Amino acid sequence: MIQQESRLKVADNSGAREILTIKVLGGSGRKFANIGDMIVATVKQAIPGGTVKKGDVVKAVIVRTVSGVHRIDGSYIKFDENAAVIVRDDKSPVGTRIFGPVARELRDNNYMRIVSLAPEVL
């Protein structure tokens, strides 16, 4: 579960390395975000020459969480880190590559471009 002030690793080549959650989108008073949810975040660490800079306010979608997610078939999937992909307003990723596996729940939330760029979908 990702909440306000949570720090996440960025799993794409947009230039950001770490982001800090400002707000969880999707209703007033919503406190937590899981895999496939959109957040508003600020860039805390960035590489030189990247598309996004340190201090930029961006939207991102959660692709991996340590807390994991329950599936309908009874299985449960967890990851070793919390990670997100920076996206534009039309849900397309800013970067051109995705690093690491992503969860299958992104397909249900119509993030097909992220799923197609990912090296592995779990």
From Swiss-Prot:
UniProt KW Isomerase keyword: no
List, alphabetically, the Pfam families matched. Ribosomal_L14
Is Ribonucleoprotein one of the keywords UniProt gives this record?
A: yes
PANTHER family from the xrefs? Answer: 50S/60S RIBOSOMAL PROTEIN L14/L23, LARGE RIBOSOMAL SUBUNIT PROTEIN UL14M
Q: What does this protein do?
A: Binds to 23S rRNA. Forms part of two intersubunit bridges in the 70S ribosome.
Of which family is this protein a member? Belongs to the universal ribosomal protein uL14 family.
The cross-references to HAMAP family, in alphabetical order and at most eight, read:
Ribosomal_uL14
Tell me how this protein assembles: Part of the 50S ribosomal subunit. Forms a cluster with proteins L3 and L19. In the 70S ribosome, L14 and L19 interact and together make contacts with the 16S rRNA in bridges B5 and B8.
Its name, as the record gives it, is: Large ribosomal subunit protein uL14
Q: What is the species listed in this Swiss-Prot or TrEMBL entry?
A: Oenococcus oeni (strain ATCC BAA-331 / PSU-1)
